[in-house]
Every structure is written in structure tokens, then in C-alpha cells.
């Protein structure tokens, strides 16, 4: 088996350009991450291969110049960096299928919620470089938030490689695995929470007489603008909020209504509930 780019030099070097990358699974998260890697300019699309059991999601990858296959074995045999982008309950089945072909030259990156590094390392050959990564849906637009955590045999070199390749996907951060479940609630599920808020904002404007189509467009732009300002200003959310709240003005009256409705507690509770569910899924996989 030839694993081009299998050198220990994983920094921004010609070796990165030569690395072979594989995806097992062809869903939205795989597509977003693959787009980010291509956008990095570090790896040509021809160095990427993706497998899926059907052709349903593969055409969009082919349009990007990525090789496609129905064989997971082909992905493992022709790649050094392999992303596991299948549903959590399928992970054990996939690893059982490919584990005999995985070597210490491979880097295995799991994108599955709830599947711990310990579980991955148990199902793979001893010494395998394992990393957990939790992206979110905006990775498809290269505006994602990704948290990565390294296993016991992965370290600075693998971190450098992934940060180089995934930077265009959006914000890339590293942390202990204990933060992964919180990240699922904050950013993975949090995207849907923001959509609920956007819908509610638009509904409020409709109640006050604005056409629904216009209200949805303005709600989306309002959230986008507020997010960019929060990200780029360096200010705390409370500071930016205070800048909008003039004494006796419209905004402070609206915030009072949110507080009376338990908005802040509901948001905290939503992140907690999603995080706990991610932890439960992980515990179920351990028992299985």
C-alpha cells in the first residue's frame, strides 16, 4: 500500500500538498470539510477520495474533482488521512471492516458525535493516530466552527496538519475531549437554536405587519451582521448589547420582554440538553 505524504513533516510544506485524504461517508459534514480542504489550496482535489454505499451524495464531490468509490477498502488503501463521516451507530461496523488495513502511518479523524476517543482506539490497531473533530453545518459555506481533540497517539504534528487543512472551513480550535459534548450543544445543535430565534424574530415582525418574506430576509441579515460584529469587534456580548440599549429606548424594552420570557435560561438549558444527549449517545456506544 502506498501512502503518499506519509512523512512526519506535517507543517505547511510540499509534503502536505502530496498527502492523500479519504472520507468514509458523503453527507453534508463531509462535503463541508472536503470543500475547506480544497479551498486551503494545500491539497489538490485529485488527492481526495470519498466512499459511500450509494451514488446519492457523490455527484457534488465529483463536481469538485474528488474521486468517488463505493469501497471503504479503496479509501483506506489509498489515503493517509481518513475522515470517518458516517452516523455514530455505523462507526463500529466501519472500523471492524477496515481495521486490519489501518497502519501506524494513518491518521483517523472521527466526525461522529458521542463516539469517544477511547472507543475509537479500542476498535483500531494499537498505536493508531486518532483525532475527534466536531464540525457544524456552516462548514458547508466555509463559515463553520470546529473543535478538535487528539487521542493518546496523536499530537502536535497532527494538530498542525489539520489546522493547515481545515482553516478555510472556519474557526478551528483544539481542546480536551471533555469539551466535545459541550461543543455539540453550543455549535452543532446551536445552529438550529439560532434558526429558531431567527424564525421567532421574523414572526414578531409579521405580527407587527411586515410581509413574511421580507421579515425572514431581514432576520437572517440581522443575525449575520450581529455575528460578524461579535466575532470581529473583540468585545463581549454584554458590551455590544449595552451599545444598542439606549436609556428608555426600544431595545431595553425588548430585552426586558425576553428576560420575562426566560430567554436566557431557555438558551442555557438548550445547550445543556443537547450536550447531555451527546454524552448519553456516547455512553450507549460504550455499552454496545
UniProtKB/Swiss-Prot annotation:
Pathway terms, separated by semicolons: Amino-acid biosynthesis; L-proline biosynthesis; L-proline from L-glutamate 5-semialdehyde: step 1/1
Subunit structure: Homodecamer; composed of 5 homodimers.
Species whose genome carries this gene: Danio rerio (Zebrafish)
Similarity comment: Belongs to the pyrroline-5-carboxylate reductase family.
Organism taxonomic ancestry: Eukaryota, Metazoa, Chordata, Craniata, Vertebrata
Compartments, as annotated in UniProt: Cytoplasm
Gene (name only): pycr3
Gene3D superfamilies per record: NAD(P)-binding Rossmann-like Domain (3.40.50.720), ProC C-terminal domain-like (1.10.3730.10)
Protein name (database record): Pyrroline-5-carboxylate reductase 3
Keyword Disulfide bond among UniProt keywords: no
